[in-house]
Amino acid sequence: FYPCMPYAHKYANAATEHGLIEALRRFLPQDGALSGMLQAGKSLASKDIEGILQLLVDAEMKMFQGLNTPVIFMQNVIVDLLYGLGIHEAFRMFADHVKSRYDAEPGFITMNLPALLDVLERQGVDNPIVCANINKIGFRMSGGLPLYEQIIATRRVRPIAMSVLASGALPAREAVEYVCR
């Protein structure tokens, strides 16, 4: 399994349907649920980004307990939001937590590979696994196709292609041949 988290809509819906305390109780690991709620409250009150991030990851990983999860991805909505807000240290915090707590590699999903890769390098996330739009016609590829090709050829990154078919604009064989070369 390759979990992708945190799924923000799930938390918003749960808080709306069940209230904040019940939502926290449902998503926090059962062992130490009270301490988890206290930690969540403390992290939110102090705006402790690392504590909040760890709680969200741990809550999501609860459903994968006992399963092999070699890579844990941070969802693109969160990645690109943190990038845009300039909270770049959160990427290092996520990477460190995923490695130390789950013995997994961190992965990042983004709509802007060039910008994110620069930030990850500055944060010390070496040779990251990054899932981004990569396709033959440059569909939704921030910076354009030539820049992505240059990055993939010259920089330390392990890319995973999404939107390979460019939202149906490319025939499957042509699309797959491009990303596999």
Predicted feature locations:
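Beta/alpha (TIM)-barrel catalytic core signal, keyed to glycine-rich beta->alpha loops juxtaposed to Asp/Glu
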Residues: 65-66, 70, 78-181
